[in-house]
Design a protein with these regions (language model features):
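Radical SAM enzyme core and accessory elements
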Residues: 32-35, 44, 66-129
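Short glycine-/small-residue motifs
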Residues: 26-27, 83
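Short, small/polar residue-rich loop motifs at catalytic or cofactor-binding pockets
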Residues: 8-13
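Hydrophobic "anchor" residues
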Residues: 22-24
């Protein structure tokens, strides 16, 4: 099932940012990773939005599981968390090919939600019987 947010899940990125000067950039959260990270070199005056799909940074975010680290690909929760928020995976030496800095917290949260949902669904089924 596609993710409703780019913060988690393996769905392709579906948004770009248009700055006030007309520049087409990747999402603003990438500004936290390194200087110039969201820059594409595109603008609304000379480029179509579809051209952003050819930008290496955006193209990499269309790959789903293939763009994740081996550790993430082997994780049982990868379909849910998708490696976490893209910006949270950045490291100077390895780029974005890392688990989220919040990996442990994401795992705890996802397992907690799954347990609560499982209990709620089970309780609802018992009441229906």
């Amino acid at each position: 099932m596609p993710s409703g947010t780019e913060a988690v899940g393996t769905s392709p990125v579906v948004a770009v940012v248009v700055d006030t000067d007309g520049a087409i950039e990747q999402v603003d959260s990438l500004k936290t990773t390194y200087a110039g990270a969201p820059v594409t070199g595109l603008d609304v005056f000379r480029h179509a939005f579809d051209q952003a799909l050819d930008h290496p940074g955006i193209a990499a975010r269309q790959l789903g599981l293939a763009a994740l680290s081996a550790e993430c690909q082997e994780c049982a929760l990868v379909q849910v968390c998708g490696g976490g928020n893209y910006a949270h995976r950045f490291r100077t030496d390895t780029g974005f090919l890392n688990p989220s800095v919040y990996c442990t917290d994401l795992e705890h949260l996802i397992r907690h939600i799954a347990q609560r949902l499982s209990s709620a669904v089970g309780d609802a089924r018992l009441r229906e019987a």
